[in-house]
Amino acid sequence: MEQPLPTAAAEAAAAGGDGEAYRIRPLELADISRGFLGLLNQLSPSPPLTEEAFRARFEELAALGADHLVLVAEDAATGRLAAAGAVLVERKFIRRCGRVGHVEDVVVDAAARGRGLGERVVRRLVEHARGRGCYKVIINCTPELTGFYAKCGFVEKNVQMGLYF
């Protein structure tokens, strides 16, 4: 049987308040046929992913339980996905073995932008991280997106650096 990612904690994070047009819910295996990979490709163009590779990664993330949550916004009329985002909970030694939420891979389909879907997905991810006991939630973004994330309650802090392979 197909299970959403990751479980009941994800359902709590996704529940309520999104009206009739879109339902925000955890990622499911069947979402590969609802446009999930095409949606991610709008964020970061990538080579095609096979269904087998998608299934393997889905199962790997599901094994992490509530420490990794992928939410999607599903169009109630068409069943297609219009937005997605993820949060990963990092377990630390500092702050008395505290936890930090990392928001990643937030994307809204080009045809669905301007409807508040991105903000609703991000707010649900933040609430999930709060519920997991995170003392902060962070996101790295381009300068063009700082205004969007400010609307979601984030403030500019520090400098992001990266090393890509």
UniProtKB/Swiss-Prot annotation:
Pfam family, one: Acetyltransf_1
Protein name: Glucosamine 6-phosphate N-acetyltransferase 1
Alphabetized InterPro entries for the sequence: Acyl_CoA_acyltransferase, GNAT_dom, GNPNAT1-like
GO CC entries: endoplasmic reticulum membrane
Domain (N-acetyltransferase): residue spans on this chain: 22-165
EC number(s) per entry: 2.3.1.4
Family, similarity comment: Belongs to the acetyltransferase family. GNA1 subfamily.
Keyword Transferase among record annotations: yes
Disruption of the gene: reported phenotype: Short roots, disruption of microtubules and shrinkage of cells in the root elongation zone.
Native source species: Oryza sativa subsp. japonica
Subunit-level organization: Homodimer.
Catalysed transformations (reactions): D-glucosamine 6-phosphate + acetyl-CoA = N-acetyl-D-glucosamine 6-phosphate + CoA + H(+)
Pathway participation: Nucleotide-sugar biosynthesis; UDP-N-acetyl-alpha-D-glucosamine biosynthesis; N-acetyl-alpha-D-glucosamine 1-phosphate from alpha-D-glucosamine 6-phosphate (route I): step 1/2
Function according to Swiss-Prot or TrEMBL: Acetyltransferase involved in de novo biosynthesis of UDP-N-acetylglucosamine (UDP-GlcNAc) in roots and is required for maintaining normal root cell shape. UDP-GlcNAc is an essential metabolite that serves as an initial sugar donor for N-glycan synthesis and thus plays an important role in protein and lipid glycosylation.
Gene Ontology molecular-function annotations: glucosamine 6-phosphate N-acetyltransferase activity
Binding site for substrate: S44, K92, F93, I94, R95, E104, D105, V106, Y135, K136
Record's keyword terms, sorted: Acyltransferase, Endoplasmic reticulum, Membrane, Transferase
Residues binding acetyl-CoA, per UniProt: G114, R115, G116, L117, G118, E119, Y149, A150, K151
